[in-house]
């Protein structure tokens, strides 16, 4: 057996799977160490992928050559495009998944990836060489005493580092229910000088479908014409969808839950870690929104071949018997059987300001962090970090330049820049509001933004790149056709009337007609034979047609955001020396000197985004390093 590898990935969650798959596909001899080969990319919380901003991230992962979207498409139970009633920048794909099949598909993917090897064990300690000018990672020692060496190590340990689970007054060490915690790694990193902290997350009870009165619940169906998450033609949209169900709490439910507040580890000081602001427990909701008489919950199926349902919105660490009594007071759940109660978990993380934009640590060469160890929450955020860490660990090994996505290039770029530049004081999740350029960063154009880069890196196959080029050509052809084609007055009046649009009093270019919100290529193709002929001859897909339409309707906004982004790029091109002494610049505020010294931004653009660095401080840096 080989004990020497190019890259070692510690942890088989969503970040670890993407990191290992990317590194191995690029040619690195990669070892993935995981506690349980049956739980790759396990959906420890809700059985879904995507959602607001998260769906955009998954499409970006796919456009770069990651695997999450493809595996999601193969295991989708229900698909919805969220925010469809809003502008295209807000559209967010979400898929309900079969969690068992999702994990099994990831296992199949990993076991059939060339250059990738798997070792089932627990990492106990990271190994370092401190003899040189800078410390570097050299490998991993496992609980079984095996030492593996590598040029790079990617830590993707999720919630397992010194994890502690809580349910009421009961508590036990663990990374999640049924799995042990990982001890030793945090200590080995703290000894190297890494700052550590504690965070908290939680999950709701799982319910038995045989004991749920679905007739009393409001069904939530998927889209009538579902799309999918991957751009690849190798996957198909879901054919047979399973519904979710909407339920509500009540004052009676709330009163029952409050009887356990004195035994809540969140409220009695047992848990010190900070929980996710945007995914609060049910007891947090009752405290924060004490005046609300009901809260919305969603029952979500966990798979085709299981009776297990996930109660989204009811995360809790209250005593199990309190959860049990409260659940039985919810309409439709009066006789429900609980497979397992909700619980909270507290775990170690490392403030991400200790990272470079490549996700390599500043303290130790060759050591990368990805996922919840960086203070994030969510499968999608973790997978994105894992993908970039895997890419960059390989590229550094072979002497190639790092891949750093900018804030106007991808939500992934926003994610990593926020982590590295601003840090976190609570579990970080992505929202569209975090992106300054969300009109540029739409879910529909993730391939146009990133697939050429994915192909250049080596993760996009020739087949997928050829399909991408065909789509791009179709989009360009359709926009060009719209620009040069004139429509006579009265020629499409019947169609305009059918969509409540004003008739044309004079001829206009098709492009200008499409600027009206209610006008679509699909409807126009029924009354303009030349348009229908073009679409048929080129075999244009619905996605290509929709992309062309969005580019036309939003062109003004798109150009404005591009202009703003180009102006700000000038700041990104002004470098700051890595060893610059900020304390020597008395014209900077004390807070700015402290923050800049701690975070060590590489450019003035990054410095400008650090909380506590004012526009006046940025001007001082511009004077020093050149405008």
Predicted regions and their residues:
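Extended, charge-enriched "interface" segments that sit outside catalytic cores
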Residues: 434, 440, 451-619, 623-627
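Conserved N-terminal/central alpha/beta ligand/cofactor-binding core
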Residues: 21-125, 144, 156-176, 180, ...
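Beta1/beta-strand and adjacent pyrophosphate-binding region of the FAD-binding site
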Residues: 2-15
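Core beta-strand elements of the Rossmann-like FAD/NAD(P) dinucleotide-binding domain
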Residues: 3-5, 143-152
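An anion/pyrophosphate-binding glycine-rich loop and adjacent beta-alpha core
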Residues: 36-37, 186-324, 421-494, 498-506, ...
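Internal hydrophobic alpha-helix adjacent to the cofactor/substrate pocket in enzyme cavities
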Residues: 382-403
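Conserved beta-strand-loop-beta-strand element in the redox core of flavoprotein oxidoreductases
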Residues: 127-147
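A glycine-rich dinucleotide-binding beta-alpha-beta segment and adjacent secondary-structure elements
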Residues: 310-376, 404-417, 541-595, 600
